[in-house]
Structures are given as structure tokens and as C-alpha cells.
């Protein structure tokens, strides 16, 4: 069984640096999906960004995080944020969490230890 370990925390607190170091040390690591989507949208002139269409952006992030989750094959894999991070941002912005998203979070559990970078 794969141990999927999430590294979470506020923006700019070192999550990506930790992920890069773990990758250098040979661990399978998954990048921050939100950043990739935003960069792609800015490059292509798209509007699926958190400041233009948070609902659509969140759906895309959750879908891509689910793909990351389901692709795990190694004994231990690290994630720069997880599915639950997306739901937390929705709650913060008072956006209702759909039953689909709740189901995805409930049916795709990460390892019970989560690392949170300090602010």
C-alpha cells in the first residue's frame, strides 16, 4: 500500500523546496497543481484562475489532484498539497463544497501524518 504523504502550509513557506529536496533524494514527488494551472492559464490567456473563476479553477485542481493520487505506485510518495487543501480554500472563501468533491476527499485518503510548514 502506498503511503501518500502531504506537505501543506501557507504560500511561500517552503513546501516546494521540501518537495524538490525529497525528489533529489529519490522519492516520488507530486508538484503543486495550482501553480501549474495558473502558469498555463497566464501563458495561454485562459480564465481558469482563482481570481477569475474560482469554482472552475477549484474543480480543475481537484480533478488533477485526483489524477496525481490515483497514479501512485511507489511505497512512499509526497504531495505538494493534497485534495483536502482545495476544500479548505473553498471553505475559506465561503464557496459550497459539492457532494462530488466531498466524495472524492472521503474516498481518497492520504497517509495519517501530514507535514505542515510553519508560517
Regions found by a protein language model. Name each.
Residues 14:
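Conserved glycine(s) of the Walker
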Residues 17:
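Conserved Walker
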Residues 79-119:
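ATP-dependent NMP and nucleoside kinases share a basic, alpha-helical "lid"
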Residues 7:
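Hydrophobic anchor at the beta1->P-loop junction of P-loop NTPases
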Residues 57-74, 99-110:
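Short amphipathic alpha-helices and their capping/turn segments at secondary-structure boundaries
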Residues 11:
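The conserved Walker
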Residues 4, 75-78:
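Residue-level preference for the first positions of well-ordered beta-strands
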Residues 20-64:
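Conserved substrate/cofactor phosphate-moiety recognition/catalytic segment
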Amino acid at each position: 500500500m502506498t503511503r501518500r504523504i502531504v506537505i501543506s502550509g501557507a504560500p511561500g513557506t517552503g513546501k516546494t523546496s521540501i518537495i524538490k529536496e525529497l525528489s533529489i533524494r529519490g522519492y516520488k514527488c507530486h508538484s503543486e497543481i495550482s501553480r501549474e494551472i495558473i502558469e498555463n492559464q497566464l501563458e495561454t490567456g485562459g480564465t481558469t484562475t482563482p481570481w477569475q473563476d474560482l469554482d472552475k479553477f477549484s474543480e480543475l485542481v481537484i480533478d488533477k489532484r485526483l489524477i496525481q493520487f490515483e497514479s501512485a505506485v511507489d511505497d512512499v510518495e509526497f504531495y505538494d498539497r493534497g485534495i483536502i487543501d482545495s476544500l479548505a480554500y473553498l471553505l475559506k472563501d465561503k464557496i459550497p463544497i459539492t457532494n462530488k468533491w466531498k466524495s472524492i476527499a472521503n474516498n481518497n485518503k492520504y497517509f495519517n501524518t501530514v507535514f505542515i510548514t510553519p508560517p
